[in-house]
Amino acid sequence: SDKKEENAMEKNLTTGSVFKNVILFSLPYLLSYFLQTLYGMADLFIIGQYDGVASTTAVSVGSQIMHMITVMIVGLAMGTTVSIAQAIGADNKKQASKAVGNTIVLFMGVAIVGMALLLMLVHPIVSVMSTPAEAVNGTVTYLTICFIGIPFITAYNIISAIFRGMGDSKSPMYFIVVACIANIVLDYLFMGALKLGPAGAALGTTISQAISVLVSVIVIIKRKSVVLSKKDFKPYREVMGKILYIGIPIAVQDGLIQVAFIVITIIANQRGLNDAAAVGIVEKIISFLFL
């Protein structure tokens, strides 16, 4: 039964049809990415129904920044996926556990430092974005709440990276489905019923990510999928080095693609509120095409 428990999460991609394995593994991964993009779109769609152009612009500018941060975390977490996959491929359980433990320590540090830095820089970020005056307060509020939620975004993405490294790309997809449904329900509650505007959009996003992390942690505990000892959390230079060596170039590459979108947003923001809102919505649609 232990073997069964292990196999519930760990899937050997080196046996059977390569093409079939690749398709079965990559489809849920693509779908997860697609749903993550849908996240910011839901906020925009729902605030557009209940609020004015200023609030829509605030959410569109704020979610653009959050999307950039998210794709960079996803890119960095790719270092974890590769490290774990290589250890499992080499049938080295100890190394896989070490990679998981070091990932948790490394990304906890990244999340806390990132959150503190971004909260300190929230006003300069909103200024650099040339946010239209009417949308400044809404954007600051949206980003402040979302920045507080960065540990949840990071936790979701490293848990997903660990699952994928073990050959399971379906579970992360289910976690993001939970987050998307919760986000839509909470958006209608906070923006529709409670009329909280951009703050409601940010609260919906942050709380739904926390729910998603909670669900994924429960799944890990129930399945006993990852067995870690104290020494796995001890930072190993070569383990963390490898995660960063693989993850940083991917994070930078994905971040630079988003910089191009942000430059367009800045130009649109300088043209006033209506242009800013319109471009923000169109850019969300273009993000899909970049998947």
Where are these regions (language model features)?
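Helix-terminus/linker motif at the lipid-water interface of multi-pass membrane proteins
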Residues: 38-57, 126-133, 189-196, 255-288
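Structural signal for membrane-spanning alpha-helices in multi-pass inner-membrane proteins
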Residues: 118, 161, 187, 191, ...
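Alpha-helical transmembrane segments of multi-pass membrane transporters/permeases
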Residues: 107, 162-185, 203-206
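A short glycine-centered flexible hinge/capping loop motif at secondary-structure junctions
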Residues: 51-52, 85-93, 167, 197-198, ...
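Short alpha-helical transmembrane segments in multi-pass integral membrane proteins
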Residues: 1-26, 84-149, 193-248
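Transmembrane alpha-helical core residues of multi-pass small-molecule transporters
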Residues: 63-66, 110, 178-182, 204-212, ...
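Signature of the first transmembrane helix
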Residues: 20-81, 85, 248-268
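Small-residue-rich hydrophobic transmembrane alpha-helices
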Residues: 56-116, 153-172, 279-291
